[in-house]
Amino acid sequence: MKIIDLNSAGGIGANCLYCQVGDFHFVIDSGLNPKQVGRSATPDLRPLVGVKLDLIFITHCHLDHIGSLPLLMRHQPNTPVIMTLPSRMLIERMLHNSSNVMVREREEKGIMEYPLFTHDEIDRIAPRLLPHPLNSPKKFAGAQDDIEFTFHAAGHIAGACGVEIVHKHRRIFFTGDVLFSPQRILDGAKLPRVHFDTLVTETTHGATDKPPGNLRSNEMIRLIDTINRTLLRGGSVLIPVFALGRMQEILAILHDARKFNRLGAAPIFASGLGMDLCDYLDDISKKTGLVHFTRTILKELKIKKSPRDLVPGKEPPTQGIYVVSSGMMVEKTASYTLASCLVGNAKHSICFVGYCDPDTPGGHLQAAQNGEEFLFAAVNVKARIRAQIERFEFSGHATREELLDYALACQPRSIVLTHGDPPARAWFATQLAEKLPQAKVLDPVPLQPYQV
């Protein structure tokens, strides 16, 4: 197999892998790098010049995996795009939201390249976005060659899948983003533990030791305890969340706690894209049974819209639990503004429930010490950190030990490392060299072709 990583910045970003098996050409994912802006955030598609792709696979609907898909499809006007049914139900909504954000950033930040694609273009490509069920092998004839592919549930978020490719007698597996343990609203990954000639694996947590005893169930209890203690001292709780997956999981956890009288009495506020996606997950749950979330949760929690009259740096008008995006507290989002309102008072808590890039405001706040001054530059607020800042392990990614165990179970002849920062990939390269010495381990340099 020939493989080229089109994510020019490497690491975790504009995920996009170009592969050729025999005379069959395909791409896995086409994302945007959240650390970049404009065209620099997109994959480098120059290696595809003159190439007619037979298929494009989408592993899941996070923007670092789908955010540049309309651009790729623009250059491949006849290529079908295949994904799971839940991903097909989500993808248009996620792309339309991305276009809206780019229009706003063009106006606010003067990024004249934005939007990279329009709502009309999303509507035009929609007929080429095709669903395919899990665990259902399908033969696909390309222009000059054919393959068989199978999707396997990868946990992570609704619709996430690993992709198994069979070409002649060769078996290849792409894990995508994977979580083996179950979440409150989603079952864990069910990946095939069989021999593969080539394994292409994510490495997100390769540099992260598994904290002892941090089972998701324990973290749920710790989160509810933190909320209750905050409410008892008269404070409010901010829970910054990713709109797709994490918001719905946190709302389900709050619903469970309230149902069993384990959550203090306080209004719960939520708004934005995540609330809209609650409808989508409710629909996915009803149609596929692959998600465990219903709109009944919102009704029984009596969710209120987040107040629009928040003044940065000033106390919110109502004590409550605020479940809002963005998860990394990106500037000019609801979580960013609310953090500026709460961080200076010791009665409040800010509870992070997902990964924060160290270069984002959320990452900066987690790294800061209590008593330090913290600048919310986008709203011109400077406050001394007094609030309780907590991080909870609700990761959507497998531990490095789980991924290593999976690689050992598959006994591949070659392993390709993807979706990880350099230290994460280095850990896997070292461990695999020791435990699978017969396997060729490849950490691809972006835009360089490799034969595996």
Tell me the role of every PLM-derived stretch:
Residues 1-51, 131-187, 313-315, 321, ...:
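Core dinuclear metal-dependent hydrolase active-site scaffold
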Residues 9-14, 21-79, 83-125, 180-188, ...:
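Pre-active-site segment of Zn-dependent metallo-hydrolases
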Residues 20-22, 166-168, 189-193, 253-260, ...:
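Short, solvent-exposed amphipathic alpha-helical segments in soluble enzyme
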Residues 28-30, 53-62, 69, 81-84, ...:
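Active-site neighborhood of phospho(di)ester-bond hydrolases with catalytic His/Asp-centered motifs
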Residues 95-157, 286-318:
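Metallo-beta-lactamase
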Residues 181-270, 349, 354, 373-440:
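Cap/insert and terminal regions of metallo-dependent hydrolase folds
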Residues 223-361, 418:
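Hard-cation-handling environments
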Residues 282-320, 370-411:
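C-terminal helical cap/extension that packs against the catalytic core
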